[in-house]
Amino acid sequence: MGRKDAATIKLPVDQYRKQIGKQDYKKTKPILRATKLKAEAKKTAIGIKEVGLVLAAILALLLAFYAFFYLRLTTDDDPDLDQDED
């Protein structure tokens, strides 16, 4: 019976450590929250690489269309010039 009573009573050192742990957690909680928000913002933010890749893809498509129409028009003009000269 004496052992049960002794187990429920905590040592003052353990109580002190628990109290310090609670205070430390309360202090670091806003810091942890701010760090978590920074990491989340970094993950969801559009980076320069993604923007550059999108712009490069659009530029490549525009150049492809331009080259297609340029080559299409120049091949049509060449036979007409040859026929007029003869």
From Swiss-Prot:
Membrane topology: Single-pass membrane protein
Phylogenetic classification of the source organism: Eukaryota, Metazoa, Chordata, Craniata, Vertebrata
Main location: endoplasmic reticulum
Transmembrane segments: 51-71
Keyword field: Endoplasmic reticulum, Membrane, Transmembrane, Transmembrane helix
Annotated family: Belongs to the TRIQK family.
Protein name (database record): Triple QxxK/R motif-containing protein
InterPro entries: TRIQK
Subcellular location: Endoplasmic reticulum membrane
GO CC, alphabetical: endoplasmic reticulum membrane
Any Pfam family: TRIQK
